[in-house]
């Protein structure tokens, strides 16, 4: 295999999906520890610790606004190059979070075993479903009193509609947690407390029968019964089903104590796919093609008001990035030179001179790059599957100075091109309705309108709870629909027809009465 093909085969690009507080920050930190990107755990602070972190990963770099390193972490593990993309939790949750999942080849789902499957996890899994993304699952927090593990598997299968294949099985829980049993290698790994900040060689015992004394007779007998049940009731791991997104291997442990994380990472790097081919409008692009192609899935604004610079996150789909190379911007038809792309290496932030399929690079963007833009080395090619997602929170924008309406419209449309919010212009009023997935986005927009466009605005409630894009192949039926439902219709910032529903029932009735109209929760960029 050539050096070029080896580099591609090494890459594993993924994101972690979880509900806030399920342990994403902790598990990220342990992965960085195993990847030698940090020396001891406990250096990554989550928001509630009071550190000003722009994501959960690094302290804010006040000198240059947002720390770009927080959004992508690259580190080596087991002969692989891991690209871990951040999916923010809590109040900075936005459409970006959803769209990041379109740039990965697999995902790690972290479930809080005390609480089970939660709301945010369901939403993120629905996005993974759009591309049948392979999912690995880590059941976290077994050093606490958790739900019954069989019950947890049942819940994942019923709510998330994915088969579970347990790879290991917990021995006890909470203060009686003794370790995990590897179902495929007949090996017990014994748990000890107090090693969360380091890589610790937990004791292993080959053969379940040989671990009887170490775990105690009562737990041993319970475990034997559980294993019989599990083997009878759950699914065997099947690599093909995993790669098709139909089955998830499940690992148990506690990220805080750094127990079970290594086993999960070993399985992840073994089974998760290398960079996959990508669908474009003209053809399918293979990861091992020689020419550089890729797309922008996220734009991050600089928080430093003196610099209107933005960073466009570019997922390489094929070819090799080299410093100083020229690329073709498909939407504008112009050539663009990449002189100083940012590359992301956890721990060391040196400018790496090259990147391969699966890698993410940051392009400096002064307003010319939009989410969903494709770049090639000359071929006219647009990648598909980088969607806009229907917002979930809506507010009416109130302008403090009516003479600034033009500046407000320009600002809202430009900011919506960055993908954090969406703007809607209703048919029957001069209102501007702003929609977002996360509540923080409204504050960010108001702040940036004031500082970058010199427009002051506030918000008020609006009778909208759901938005759906409208598509129809029959022009007459579409025109009839527009006349009948004009009170609910609007155009989004890019000019697409949208239905703004006051209630879920209203939307359902409109869909039932108009079977030829497509009401879509996503639209392509």
Swiss-Prot record:
- Does the record carry Ubl conjugation as a key word? no
Quick one: a GO cellular component term? cytosol
Q: Name one GO biological process term.
A: regulation of translational termination
Its localization reads:
Cytoplasm
Q: What are the residue boundaries of the tr-type G domain, all occurrences included?
A: 9-276
**Keyword entries, A-Z:** Cytoplasm, GTP-binding, Nucleotide-binding, Protein biosynthesis
**Which residues take part in binding GTP?**
18-25, 86-90, 140-143
Primary localization class, coarse: cytoplasm
For molecular function, the Gene Ontology terms on record are: GTP binding; GTPase activity; guanosine tetraphosphate binding; translation release factor activity, codon nonspecific; translation release factor activity, codon specific
SUPFAM superfamilies attached to this UniProt entry: EF-G C-terminal domain-like, P-loop containing nucleoside triphosphate hydrolases, Translation proteins
Q: Has keyword Transport?
A: no
Q: Which residues form a coiled coil?
A: none
Q: Which InterPro entries match?
A: EF-G-like_DII, EFG_III/V, G_TR_CS, P-loop_NTPase, PrfC, RF3_C, RF3_dom_3_sf, RF3_GTP-bd
**Similarity section:** Belongs to the TRAFAC class translation factor GTPase superfamily. Classic translation factor GTPase family. PrfC subfamily.
**Tell me, what does this protein do in biology?**
Increases the formation of ribosomal termination complexes and stimulates activities of RF-1 and RF-2. It binds guanine nucleotides and has strong preference for UGA stop codons. It may interact directly with the ribosome. The stimulation of RF-1 and RF-2 is significantly reduced by GTP and GDP, but not by GMP.
Recorded hits in NCBIfam families, A to Z, give: prfC, PRK00741.1, small_GTP
- Protein name as it appears in the record: Peptide chain release factor 3
